[in-house]
Every structure is written in structure tokens, then in C-alpha cells.
Amino acid sequence: MVEADHPGKLFIGGLNRETNEKMLKAVFGKHGPISEVLLIKDRTSKSRGFAFITFENPADAKNAAKDMNGKSLHGKAIKVEQAQKPSFQSGGRRRPPASSRNRSPSGSLRSARGSRGGTRGWLPSHEGHLDDGGYTPDLKMSYSRGLIPVKRGPSSRSGGPPPKKSAPSAVARSNSWMGSQGPMSQRRENYGVPPRRATISSWRNDRMSTRHDGYATNDGNHPSCQETRDYAPPSRGYAYRDNGHSNRDEHSSRGYRNHRSSRETRDYAPPSRGHAYRDYGHSRRDESYSRGYRNRRSSRETREYAPPSRGHGYRDYGHSRRHESYSRGYRNHPSSRETRDYAPPHRDYAYRDYGHSSWDEHSSRGYSYHDGYGEALGRDHSEHLSGSSYRDALQRYGTSHGAPPARGPRMSYGGSTCHAYSNTRDRYGRSWESYSSCGDFHYCDREHVCRKDQRNPPSLGRVLPDPREACGSSSYVASIVDGGESRSEKGDSSRY
């Protein structure tokens, strides 16, 4: 509902941008005395094309509206009508007339200046809180741009721009700057070292596990939880020395492994006596090399092989575990029986079984694709088992594949001798040597602890398979371990 504003107030629209207050007063002053001329301007003090003129006599205002409406002024047709109040302001709050206090000293002419068409610093006679937009003509021309800044609050009374307008603009600028800086910092964080390092390490583990663990992917990556419980860690007497070796091995193998269980460093404790300690040092070194080619080492394999407490029996019993490790190296799912069957016997032989087993198992896992490591490590341990010292073994780490190790005094146990440690030395040299010795030492396991093997050790031609038949041969050795005697290879490949 539109109400007429002050009867003597006219709205003049469609003005030329060059028309100023003096021109308006000169043109409309012909119809009667003018109390006020209000030209609406923008922030640059340029005319926005409309103005308000207040006549002292309302009758003069009506005559001027009839006479000047639709006529051309400075090249543009203008509209002259009675100023109207906005519909949403009808019956609303009213302020006392402000024209008297805002009128210029001459009392005749004043130009209201403000941003967005608002009449800041000057208010009309009746609706003081409304500016140019508060007075719309009968044509209902929209001046909403003038209404918005004026309704902000009492700041429109003052002559300057309202603080509520400047403050949000500053905040907006700061927010926009921060928003532009935000993505940069985020992008900078996205290229941080830890994420890239995790990506590379995970890629490396995936590639390594699929390439080097082709025969035992499930065994290396996902061991059964039953096998983790089978063999308890050794007594605390070995704990301190164990940490020294485990730290060294962990650092050497961390380049290819992502998750090393804390129990590995704890469970492979070196023995308390000198001779077995040297042996166990070898097994840890081998473990570190071979573990580099596997993705995850299960904690069960670390717990299974407790360090020996006595020297010579530890070697002997290691051979039986050695064959089991060969078989397990190529089997996807080792049964829990395989770890439980070879539970340590009485204390005299308990740790002997598990002394070289860690060395054997790891070397069997790594030798198929990395002959350099498997060869050198196998040679070291075969020499060490045959009686050479730890230092001699270390001197032969860099030897070629074809060079046989130095033959030390052959070790005997219960009358059976250890043979064929240096008989064959091809790409798979160390593993085939251990096969040849399995005929002698394997029979000192859980069922034949101290029984001397009466049979001759199997010949290399019979025991050694073709290198292309690595899977079958490993199953063959696993069958030897499970049954306690030599069996035929056929049918054992079904374990895969």
C-alpha cells in the first residue's frame, strides 16, 4: 500500500548525468519557491539520474509535476511525480523531521552525498531513516539500491559511511586473502615427506613381496596365529645380547620391510655361551638379509627359534629345522603341525633344533631370486657348522658362486658325519648342500633324538632336484621333515 509522502515533495527521474542541483533549482523554481533540492549521487559524486525536490507550497509541487512530467531536460525526458513512501514503511516507525537540522546554512539548497544512492548526512522531512529509496514515484520505480545501505542502523544519520559497511569489507578482504593462502599451505602440506615416504615404502613392499616371495606369499605375509604361540621366547638370560643383534639386523633389513614386529628383536636372543653365540650371530645376519626380500616377517618365526644354550647340539638340531625351513619357503600355507611337530625335546636338544633354523628359513626364502645373498650366507653357515670360526665365515662373504668353502673338520653327531657341505655350488648352492646333509642330521629330531642314522647319506644325484623344480624339491624336503625319513618327491607338490 503506497502512501504519499510530504505533499510538497516531488520525485524527478531520468535526469541527465550532467544535471546538477543548480540546474534543477533553476528549472523547477519557476513553479514556486523550493525549500530543498536533493540530487542522488554515487560514491564518485556523480549523479545517479534522479533527485528529490521539495516545494514550500504543496500546490506548487502539483503544478510543477503536471507541467514538467515527460518533458526533456538537458537532452533527456524526465519523469516528475509525487514522491511516495515505500509500502513496507507505511505505518512504521517515524522519526522527527530532520530537515531543519540538516538544512544548509542558506536554507535553500543541499546535495545529499553517500554511497549507493543513500542520502547520508541528509534525511527527508517525514521519514528520516529513509533516504532516496524511501520516496518512490507513482510508477513504483524501484530504488532498492538506496534502501539497503540506509536500513543498516543509526549510522546513516552521520555524514560519513557507516562502520558496518567498512568493517565487513575489511573482513571480506582478509578472508579472501586467507582463503587464497589456505590452499597454498594445504598444497604445501600435501607434498610433505611422511606421506611420500609411506607411499614409496608401501609400493616397495608390494613389489618386493610379489617378486621375491613368489613361492611363499601367504606364508610370508599372513602367518597363522597358531604358529605365533607354539614356541615361547627364550629365558630372560638372553635378552640383553639379543637386543644388540636385533638392532643391527633391523636396520639392515628395514629398507625392504615395512612392519617389523617388536618381538623379533626380543625373541632371537643370542646364546649365553661363546660358540653358540657365534653361530647365532650368523643366523641373525642371515635373517636380516633374507628378511629384506619379504614383506612382513611373522612374530611366530621369531619365537619359534629360541637361541641355544649349548653349542654343539645346537648345530646338529639346526639341520632338521633347516629342512623344514626349506620346505616352508615354498609353501603357501604351512600347517601349524609343521611348527608344533618340531617342538624342542629335553633341554639338551631343545635349543639345538632352533639355532640355525632362523638362518635356514630366511636364507631359503631369499636365495631363489637373490643368489648373491643366499650363496654367501649359505657358505658362511656351512663353514661355520663344519667347524670354522666366525671370522673365517665373514671373510668369505664376498666370494664368487663357484668357489667352494674351506673344509673344516667334519662335525659328527652320534656317529653320523656331516657331508657335502662343499660338494655343489651352483646358483642354488647353499640350499642344495643342506639337502645333502639332511640324510645325516635330520634324524636327530623329535623322534630320533640321539639315534645314529645307519643309512648312508643320500647322494646328490638323488637328492638334488633340477633348479627349475624348486617347488617340488622344497616339498620333498618338507616331507622329510614331517615324516622323519626320506620319501619320494612325487605327490608332495600337492601341498602348494
Swiss-Prot record:
<dbReference type="Pfam" id="PF00076">
    <property type="entry name" value="RRM_1"/>
</dbReference>
<feature type="compositionally biased region" description="Low complexity">
    <location>
        <begin position="97"/>
        <end position="114"/>
    </location>
</feature>
<dbReference type="InterPro" id="IPR050441">
    <property type="entry name" value="RBM"/>
</dbReference>
<feature type="compositionally biased region" description="Basic and acidic residues">
    <location>
        <begin position="313"/>
        <end position="326"/>
    </location>
</feature>
<feature type="compositionally biased region" description="Basic and acidic residues">
    <location>
        <begin position="335"/>
        <end position="349"/>
    </location>
</feature>
<comment type="subunit">
    <text>Interacts with splicing factor proteins SFRS3/SRP20, TRA2B/SFRS10, KHDRBS1/SAM68 and KHDRBS3.</text>
</comment>
<keyword id="KW-0539">Nucleus</keyword>
<dbReference type="GO" id="GO:0043484">
    <property type="term" value="P:regulation of RNA splicing"/>
</dbReference>
<dbReference type="InterPro" id="IPR000504">
    <property type="entry name" value="RRM_dom"/>
</dbReference>
<feature type="compositionally biased region" description="Low complexity">
    <location>
        <begin position="149"/>
        <end position="159"/>
    </location>
</feature>
<feature type="compositionally biased region" description="Basic and acidic residues">
    <location>
        <begin position="204"/>
        <end position="214"/>
    </location>
</feature>
<feature type="region of interest" description="Disordered">
    <location>
        <begin position="452"/>
        <end position="496"/>
    </location>
</feature>
<dbReference type="InterPro" id="IPR035979">
    <property type="entry name" value="RBD_domain_sf"/>
</dbReference>
<dbReference type="GO" id="GO:0005681">
    <property type="term" value="C:spliceosomal complex"/>
</dbReference>
<dbReference type="GO" id="GO:0005634">
    <property type="term" value="C:nucleus"/>
</dbReference>
<protein>
    <recommendedName>
        <fullName>RNA-binding motif protein, Y chromosome, family 1 member C</fullName>
    </recommendedName>
</protein>
<keyword id="KW-0694">RNA-binding</keyword>
<feature type="compositionally biased region" description="Basic and acidic residues">
    <location>
        <begin position="484"/>
        <end position="496"/>
    </location>
</feature>
<dbReference type="GO" id="GO:0003723">
    <property type="term" value="F:RNA binding"/>
</dbReference>
<keyword id="KW-0507">mRNA processing</keyword>
<dbReference type="GO" id="GO:0006397">
    <property type="term" value="P:mRNA processing"/>
</dbReference>
<feature type="compositionally biased region" description="Polar residues">
    <location>
        <begin position="175"/>
        <end position="184"/>
    </location>
</feature>
<feature type="domain" description="RRM">
    <location>
        <begin position="8"/>
        <end position="85"/>
    </location>
</feature>
<dbReference type="Pfam" id="PF08081">
    <property type="entry name" value="RBM1CTR"/>
</dbReference>
<feature type="compositionally biased region" description="Basic and acidic residues">
    <location>
        <begin position="276"/>
        <end position="289"/>
    </location>
</feature>
<feature type="region of interest" description="Disordered">
    <location>
        <begin position="80"/>
        <end position="349"/>
    </location>
</feature>
<dbReference type="GO" id="GO:0042802">
    <property type="term" value="F:identical protein binding"/>
</dbReference>
<dbReference type="GO" id="GO:0032991">
    <property type="term" value="C:protein-containing complex"/>
</dbReference>
<dbReference type="InterPro" id="IPR012677">
    <property type="entry name" value="Nucleotide-bd_a/b_plait_sf"/>
</dbReference>
<keyword id="KW-0508">mRNA splicing</keyword>
<dbReference type="GO" id="GO:0048026">
    <property type="term" value="P:positive regulation of mRNA splicing, via spliceosome"/>
</dbReference>
<comment type="function">
    <text>RNA-binding protein involved in pre-mRNA splicing. Required for sperm development. Acts additively with TRA2B to promote exon 7 inclusion of the survival motor neuron SMN. Binds non-specifically to mRNAs.</text>
</comment>
<dbReference type="GO" id="GO:0008380">
    <property type="term" value="P:RNA splicing"/>
</dbReference>
<keyword id="KW-0010">Activator</keyword>
<dbReference type="InterPro" id="IPR012604">
    <property type="entry name" value="RBM1CTR"/>
</dbReference>
<feature type="compositionally biased region" description="Basic and acidic residues">
    <location>
        <begin position="242"/>
        <end position="253"/>
    </location>
</feature>
